[in-house]
Amino acid sequence: YGIEIEEKAYGLATTNMLIHGDGNSNIKFGSCFDCKDFIKQSDPVIILMNPPYNAKPIGIPATYKANWGKAKDGKEDPTKGLVFIHYLSDIIQEMNEEREKNGLPRKTVKMAVLLPVSTAIGTKNVIQEEKIAMLEHNTLEAVFTLPNEIFYPGASVSACCMVFTLGEPHVKADGTMKETFFGYYKEDGFKKKKALGRVEQFDENGDSKWKAIEEEWLRLFRNHKSVDGLSATAEVSGENEWLCEAYMKTDYSKLTEGDFQQTLNNYLAYLMKEGKIYES
């Protein structure tokens, strides 16, 4: 099952399914906001989503724009994609209410969603309101900071992956909450190649660097293990930052003189840009 509003992406998705022998892919062409019944009928257990980060507000239901102010008539979605998670959360909540009326137990749904880092950092205005609303009925299981230019040669936005359990409140009835796992997953063993994109690298034995890195990342996540410079766990609310960089400890053993010099260069460039010092 799937929903895609961009025509070329929809064509690629359906063609790919046909090539792999699936003649009934159940991929809908259109806006997810017009596919509520389709989503409910699919009865999802796992949702993978990459919402648009700059969707036009005109295509978003008015009920989700009540607190947007002038932005509701603007050119871009001020939530940077969070509103799409809110919408799916509401559908799962509605499904659970219907299940309870029919004497059935509530269900939970795992969701992994790609979003710009700005949504994880945001602690003000509309983005914070969306984060607070999300945790009312859902649990933030993990947030992974992804490699720079993950979409190369496409969009250059810095992205993260958020993992939620929909249908399970972040704060339990007794007031406690589960610690969220944060991964600083910047180095994945791929390198940028012009005209090729991000290319997988191999070691001297011909083994995939990514495969070894992937296994380590999954091990840390499954065990909720904190490793300096790579991962951390913390209790968070919608008012906090949702990025590993805010909680992990620095692994000083891996710092080099080059890292120190680069930091100084970046700071010097910032001072010059702000007009606080001038090149002589």
Residue spans of the language-model regions?
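Conserved S-adenosyl-L-methionine
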Residues: 1-46, 54-58, 117-118, 130
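A conserved structural/catalytic subdomain of Rossmann-like adenosyl-cofactor enzymes
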Residues: 41, 48, 53-280
